[in-house]
Amino acid sequence: MDDFFPVSIQRCRSYDLHCVQAAVERSLEPWGGFSAFCRRGGRILLKPNLLFGKPSETAVTTHPIIVEAVARLALDCGAQVFLGDSPPLASASRNAEKCGIGEVAERLRIPILEFHQPTHNGWRHPQKTYGIATPAISRVLQEMDLIVNLPKLKSHQQLLITGAVKNLFGCVPGRRKAYWHFKCQSRIDAFAGMLLALYEKILPGLTIVDAIVGM
C-alpha cells in the first residue's frame, strides 16, 4: 500500500455509551461524519473481534459498547446493518452472546452472520514480496456495500500487536486460520505479508479501533 491513510485519534475514558458515541462522532468529523461512508439502504457489515466467548471485562474481544455506538450511527443513516466474524473454534453468535455483543445485536435487531462459506479463490500478495498465496475469505463480504472494521487493540505473540490489519484475519472461514498460523509460524515476514494482502483485498471502508482498554 503506497498511499497514506488519514487517522483520527480521540480520547475516551470509559465505555459509557454517550462518551463512546461522542468520541466516534468527533473522530469522523473531518470526513463529514458517518453518513459520508454509507448510504440509505446500503448493506453494512460490522466486523468486531469475537475471538473467544469471554466477558467484555477481560478485554479479549471488541467491547459491546463500541459495537453499539457504531451500529446506532449506521442505523441512523438508514443502512441495513449486519455483524459477523469467524472465530477459530466456537461460532460467532455463541461468542457474541458470551461477551455481551449478542445482547446488543438482539436489541438493535442486527443479524449475526457466520463466515462459513469461502470464496473459491485465493490470491497472492500484490507485490509478490513473499511468494505466499493468501487464504480465501468469506463470501459474505462480497455481499456488502461497506465493511466497518472494529478491532480490539491487543498484544500478539507473533506480530507484537493486533489491530486494524490483523482483525481482518477473522474473515477467513473457520479453522482455516489455524493452517495459516502453522504455515507461517517460522516466517513472521510471510505472515505479515499475507495479512497485508488480505487487508488490501478486503479493504474496509472504515476502521474504528477499540483502544479504551487494551490487552
Set out the residue ranges of the language-model regions.
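N-terminal and secondary-structure boundary signal
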Residues: M1-M215
